[in-house]
Regions:
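Conserved alpha-helical "signature site"
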Residues: 1-165
Length: 165
């Protein structure tokens, strides 16, 4: 079997063996470990924080089936900065759904309101945050707890990354 066919077979096989939750955790760990010391700490934490925050907001507003895609949206949200390429170029090189692409490019999509809440919460723009929360049907009083859950999740993930000397 050619290597590309083997890879196409091995990824779904790994997903079946590990399960989605374990695979997501593994991908998060590999991503963090692979970046190493050359990338600022904020660029290590930010995609993980956004990923979990997007997922938790989605779950809170009833987008249970979309949780994995919302996680991916957050994870990919800083790939342009990590790769030093425009987001449009990054998105040409990977296969993701249109809703994720549109949200990352600032266009209207099912996921853009949730991503907007995340960005507005980070930037502290109160009026815009209120509008974003209204748009996705979320009461903003839930955000500090969801954010804290995301931060705790990152701490747990990073605690599992072996320290190399």
């Amino acid at each position: 079997m050619p290597s590309s066919q083997a890879l196409n077979h091995s990824i779904p096989h790994a997903l079946n063996l590990l399960g989605e939750v374990a695979m997501r955790k593994w991908i998060s760990l590999v991503s963090v470990a692979a970046l190493g010391d050359s990338v600022a700490d904020s660029l290590l934490r930010l995609p993980l924080l956004r990923a979990m925050f997007c997922e938790l907001i989605g779950l809170k507003v009833g987008m249970i089936r979309e949780a994995t895609e919302l996680f991916l949206l957050g994870l990919l949200s800083v790939m342009d900065a990590l790769l030093n390429l425009p987001m449009a170029v990054v998105l040409q090189e990977i296969t993701v759904g249109d809703d994720i692409k549109k949200a990352l490019l600032g266009r209207s999509s099912r996921y853009r309101p949730i991503f907007g809440v995340v960005l507005d919460y980070e930037s502290g723009t109160r009026e815009q945050l209120e509008e974003s929360c209204r748009h996705c049907g979320l009461h903003e009083n839930f955000l500090p707890d969801l954010y804290l859950q995301s931060v705790r999740w990152i701490s747990d993930i990073l605690a599992e990354v072996p320290v190399t000397a």
